[in-house]
Design a protein with these regions (language model features):
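Basic, helix-initiating cap at the start of DNA-binding domains
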Residues: 1-48, 63
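Hydrophobic alpha-helical connector segments
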Residues: 42, 46, 77-104, 123-126
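DNA major-groove recognition helix of helix-turn-helix
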Residues: 58, 68-69, 179
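Amphipathic alpha-helical linker/stalk segments
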Residues: 28-32, 37-38, 66-94
């Protein structure tokens, strides 16, 4: 009889749980100190794993930061599948609220000045989500499509909320309303 491959093996499930603990430990440590000053030993200790276990899952700090960036994206985008510009404008509210709950992680993963240390592994997933939401507007072959995608990419980024928070004191809901208005206005104008 063939083995059931639709479910992860116990080993795969344990690996996923361990990796999640390690990533969550790093996220918690980022709330306490600058990410570049966090040692792998501190992450292992916080996660309750040995250093060899940590290195088996994440051989380098760069690998660990890439996993953190993926975790940040999955956390703020979980369950979102906007199918229109209106859906996208509404989804921004959720993205910004969730980002507020992990502000220091968002700041680090999106604002780090050295992309070699903090890779951006979710760019294609974000662009695909935007293309789906913008539908016909994103399917044109003129320059409008690229301008619209680039602008909406920025408006839907948690960095937009952080910028508005830092410079204008906006809460996530107010920033989302601003971004949502701009998305709907731009998408309407691009038709």
């Amino acid at each position: 009889m063939a083995a059931d491959t639709s479910r992860p093996s116990l080993r795969q499930a344990q690996r996923a749980v361990t990796e999640q603990r390690i990533i969550e430990a790093l996220a918690a440590l980022i709330d306490q100190e600058h990410p570049l000053e966090i040692s792998m030993a501190a992450v292992a200790k916080r996660a309750g794993v040995s250093e060899p276990t940590l290195y088996r899952h994440f051989p380098t700090k760069r690998d660990l930061f890439a996993a953190l960036a993926g975790y940040q994206f999955r956390t703020v985008a979980a369950g979102l599948a906007p199918a229109s510009a209106d859906d996208l404008a509404a989804a921004v509210h959720t993205v910004f609220q969730r980002s507020a709950g992990m502000e220091n992680v968002v700041r680090w993963t999106l604002a780090a000045t050295d992309p070699e240390r903090v890779p951006r592994p979710n760019v294609q997933a974000r662009l695909a989500m935007l293309r789906t939401a913008l539908g016909d507007q994103a399917g044109r072959d003129d320059g409008t499509t690229q301008f619209l995608l680039r602008t909406v990419l920025l408006l839907t980024s948690p960095m937009a909320w952080l910028y508005w928070k830092d410079y204008l004191g906006l809460e996530p809901a107010d920033a989302a309303a601003t971004a949502g208005w701009a998305i709907k206005t731009l998408a309407g104008a691009a038709r």
